[in-house]
Amino acid sequence: MSKKPPNRPGITFEIGARLEALDYLQKWYPSRIEKIDYEEGKMLVHFERWSHRYDEWIYWDSNRLRPLERPALRKEGLKDEEELFDFKAGEEVLARWTDCRYYPAKIEAINKEGTFTVQFYDGVIRCLKRMHIKAMPEDAKGQVKSQHPLSWCCPIDPAGSCNQSMGSEDWIALVKAAAAAAAKNKTGTKPRASANSNKEKERDGGKWFKLPSKKAETSTCIVTAEIEKKEELPTSSETFGLHIDTVPKIVFPQPESTLTNKRKNNQGNSFQAKRARLNKITGLLASKAVGVDGAERKEDCSATAPVLEQAISPKPQSQKKNEAVISSSANTQKPALLSSTLSSGKARSKKCKHESGESSGCIKTPKSPLAPELIQAKDLTLVSQLSSVINKTSSPQPVNPPRPCKHSERRRRSQRLATLPMPDDSLEKLSSSSSATDGKAFSISSQNQQQSSVPEVPAIAYVPLQKLGPCLPLDLSCGSEVTGSRTPHPSYHGGECPREEKEETPLFANPTSKVVSDVKGAAAATGISKTEKKVKLEEKTSTAFGKRKEKDKEKKEKRDKDHYKPKQKKKKKKKKKSKQHDYSDYEDSSLDFLERCSSPLTRSSGSSLAPRSTFTEKTTTYQYPRAILSVDLSGENLSDVEFLDDSSTESLLLSGDEYNQDFDSTNFEESQDEDDALNEIVRCICELDEENGFMIQCEECLCWQHSVCMGLLEDSIPEQYICYICRDPPGQRWSAKYRYDKEWLNNGRMYGLSFLKENYSHLNAKKIVSTHHLLADVYGVTEVLHGLQLKIGILKNKHHPDLHLWAYSGKRKDQDQAVAEAERKITPQDRANSEGKECVQNHKEPALRMEETYITSEHSYQKPQSFSQDCQSLTDPGSSDDDDASSFEEDGELRVPDKSHLLYKNRGVSEKNPASGNKVFVYNDKKGTEGPGDSHLQWQLNLLTHIENVQNEVTSRMDLIEKEVDVLESWLDFTGELEPPDPLARLPQLKRHLKQLLLDVGKVQQIATLCSV
């Protein structure tokens, strides 16, 4: 009786269906159903990209199975009666704003793609999907027009202007009422000063600064400051630097009783919170414009140029002397100059840094220029007109967020600004940012001066404003502290800053002396020609080089004199050697032929520099946040990856004097301190990237750890130290940790107990290595014989489908020549070619193409379609050595006659080329031209020739193995350790010894766990 699979949402119980399954290591992997057993109620699950040996039978109701894409079950219950409503144009609805709250709105149009163009009750037009619109209750439909008269009673005509039908007296009265209501709100309820309240206020307030647009909108982050304090300051239109004639006037046709009684209405309490916040902002803006003469009207603005929102910051009291200049410039501004102002402003603010955690709040800006009918040429709202007027007299400022200063002395990793090629507008950034540190947010008169000399400004390529990322906020209530908080303050360049800050920015070494206090001075700095800039930049960079060298010398002297600072352990980088085992001191000369070149798979310093080298192409003078620069390489979170400057090789190269002198190990360590200054990465278990106290370096990934965190002291550092990540790589199988534990395979050394005077593995290392080589040769021969059996089976079966793979005619090549050609194509590596001995050391060789020469491998039989997968398993760090037993382990045209040669390459053991005169087949691209009758015979002939060659290879290898066994036996007989071969008599003793050894190892493991150093 067959059982029916359970109903599990997202899982299809059929063969080939994909899902996620939990393996025995408690990790989820995408999987596939291979078989289904309806009787037992379980399925054979295959983990994708893993070998089939890990396929597992899992019950179909097990919690180890889950859908590949989790369905959102909560959305299925949201289907209510809302779908029954068919909205029409002009209908009043509740539309959702960006704060996920619903506010009254009116449908303007229904688009073809199923979206609705709605106008909110405050005049903002947005394009929303059907899911963001609700039907308005019947009892609330008639209340909206009387509650908020701003946009419902001032309809928007096609020209984009607001029809004003009443006099300015009602408007002034309404403004006073709004100001009184806002003041009453402030005294009644004390505003919260938390970041969340500021964020919420600016998010809702940002809707007022938004221009109507039917197009998609992007949100750029803004920086919030003490808005509450700024709101309480009594300001007027003079604070903005605007003439009294330039402030727009808006007529509100409803009396003030409508606005004051608005909060008492209980029927509209669902959107009462937003109205209160908007009234607060309205009252604030109204209090700033109370002194406006209501009889005068502002002349027509430019309806063609798009009004872009820029940073507006009121000037401090110390700058009131420039109000006359500012107001006159505001009157003389023409709409035709707006585009040139924006372009020059863009050129000055060419690079805008990403804020690293300082942004709190978002504001909406149009992604593209607005449609002409949506641009309000006259007075739609007060804020939009204020922004359009003040934007003509303002320009964006380059933003330089201060880097966080750390009190602890950190090692200099790079000097970016002093040596990188700086763009031409860097001096403009310098002048503008230094003036911003003095409290001046921006200068309008300097903008006028720049506009008057627009042709003289050098043509600097600039990034469009939409691509600048977070720009300065459009916030009328923010003061100069907002801009000041995002520019380098002089206190950040004091004594508590790290040394790298001073070295890399010599231009800002004394910012107080560089501050341009006069507005004309800042404008003059922006008008410097290219040649003067280049000359000054060359002088600055040359002085920066000199300063850096002097500081390097001072650092060296200070290190020698400072006896209290613990010496940091600097391990020498291991240089690749062609030989690690030297048997010259041994008495027996017959062991000389056992010399093999081992392949220590130590990662070179270049591999640790690989992620950094990708950033050297960028010549920008700013630093990305560390969160963006974090690179994940097999679990290594390189959070300190920074730019390398062009002079980084200067400290890495020894000068002529240092080349000639013979320096001891201490001098080498000191010089290596300078070499590794740019390469050091601190990756400790404590997750702090600071160098404190005694540091130890991993010999594989060259990362540094605190010895205290690792539980090691200065006198207990092992000879070979490998960090915790290299020993147990995250996201990989357990067997991956043996890649870095190669001492046992290469040198025959194992870790011993510290209380023992003699280590057995150290005393008998040569014997252990010879035994390892012997076992590797035997293992390689067994694999060759297995492949030979498969090929003999093909030869016996005339109708085997894979017999045609031997249809190529071949020519012979010397094996040494083939190996040499392959090594020329492989990445540069250390080779030791002496007397026919070959050594392949690099285990990360690129997998080359092997379409038609795969049959030269005599140890394995495989279809050609799986070449890419097998080669990928070699280069993939996530795959283990024993992932696929039948995989080829060849590299392109590397014609080595046994798999063990490349097997040793992967496992850290390399073998000598056993027979230098052997030949292998390298086939041509030509296919056989025989007829169909002779084809099978020719294929069998080619295969037979190949099998004979492989048998000859096996014979020569067996001779080599026999010699190795003879040498090993004579060696053991010479030392007296060879006992008569009676394994059956010693079997019980061997079992007892193995059992006791396991018990002892378990005790040692418990001791190490409980008694950590």
UniProtKB/Swiss-Prot annotation:
Record location of the Glycyl lysine isopeptide (Lys-Gly) (interchain with G-Cter in SUMO2) cross-link: K75, K79, K530
MF-aspect GO terms: methylation-dependent protein binding; zinc ion binding
Composition skew (Acidic residues), residue ranges: 879-892
Residue pairs linked by disulfide bridges in the UniProt entry: none
Species in which this protein is naturally found: Mus musculus
The name this protein goes by in its record: PHD finger protein 20-like protein 1
Tudor domain boundaries: 11-71, 85-141
Listed PANTHER family: PHD FINGER PROTEIN 20-LIKE PROTEIN 1, PHD FINGER PROTEIN 20-RELATED
